């Protein structure tokens, strides 16, 4: 019998079913002493259901850190553990799973608070973990309102978890914490210096990490091996306030991108913006296994120890799931990253390439909309002199971006051909000033839509691809791709997940009052409208822009279809809760409210936009900088009248209460400038730094200030 088979057989034989009647401790039982040193990441619970919950810990013997360690799990109705419902011995925290252990406990009672701890026995002592507290979901017929916090994006590097600290101060009576992604960030601290050595991320095996060139002589390491990803979770879970939140509340967690790789899709990273191939399935599987080891997830219907190694991983991963909390809440936790296709505009798209030619525009009745000279194009193969100049310019730019001369030449031949937009080609030809290869007259030339018309200016860049794309032209292109691919180009959730979600929304399947979809990215449309800004220079910048098309703005037609289903199949009792964008939003999108929680600690979107706008050549004091950075919140509201509330310069969390008549939402916000202040040493000052904004979500898709 193989060691692997033996281990799995043992795990499957362990069943953690709570006793129906509480029992007490034995009179001769030795006391449990403080054993926190054996539980460096403390304890956690997750995926609460009416009759079950998953309990988690990481147990390590400091004197034998590479050895498996035997653990006992005790669950009780009281903090003193006098009324126990479970005492499970013989559990093993295995080194092969980084000493993590998670146990699904069943046969519990609905909406009941339980206390739990893990115990290690050594040298006659019983050494206990911190005591955890959890709560099961209410029974299906319970009318009790359900309360939960929404959180996301908790970069650890040089930043403090003041938001978690504040949640603990408030002592909210929550049924669970919903964490909608970016629990860890895949990068080490190489490029993010921290004066506090306790807020640094380092890899124990840096040689197995992936170097990432940030430009300007800056480099960082990003997780690649299983060891790297485990290091991230161990480090993040070392934070005392994150530990306390896990000790107090059960979590429901879904990943976004940074648990694997920034702006990822499927198993593809996007660090090099198309300069190199970044399909990384083994790296993806490593990221998933570490996530499964450290997150208490309910993965099947059975009871007992959960073996992360047995959980399906890429390409067979499934973490989307749903929860019922009484009569009023059905929660659908969706996975936006695993099944989604590539971003519609490739990061390495040649800006001049015509994506929709004159024939396509004519077939859609759009010829008149693109009649201006700016949309003129030619078949560059009919202009060999100009083609040679454009290819030479491509090679020069590509080599400057890091490609070899040979690779750049091959790409130039493959891309600089066929229909090319003069809006991009002519300025290049003008600058080259080669005799006999000057700019081409647009008069009489066909009109088409090229990537340059959507904001793509550089050969390899996220700008004009994943970020800051011109809305009106992008929408045309996205709709055409949607229709010609039978929806596949925008199938963000994948066919199976979407079918599951829509099936659960069928009449009679989900009788709960409110249907809440948890999405790691926001459905709120985030638009910068600079069209009527005469002080914006140059005039070519006066467009409407999507701030990010890595989120649902990048799949506008699929979003419309999904929101229509949510709206129509719930009788107006649908709600989306989301994160990712590092800002707080409350909006109504096509009749469906969306509450986007701010980041716990990651850089606020206003800060990120400021750096990007400056890098694009618009310094502070310029009109562009003023509109999209200084006055960013107002610009977002102007671009989307459905936005009821926005704060782009704050951290925090959102507390949601779901009742029979309405959903209440309280945004607890801390200025982003406070993220580098350690309020752990001055807790009395923290409350004064927070503000609160309250809203009510009502049936039919309305959001009002409370």
Segments the model singles out, each with a brief description of its role:
Residues 1-18:
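N-terminal secretory signal peptides and thylakoid transit peptides that target proteins
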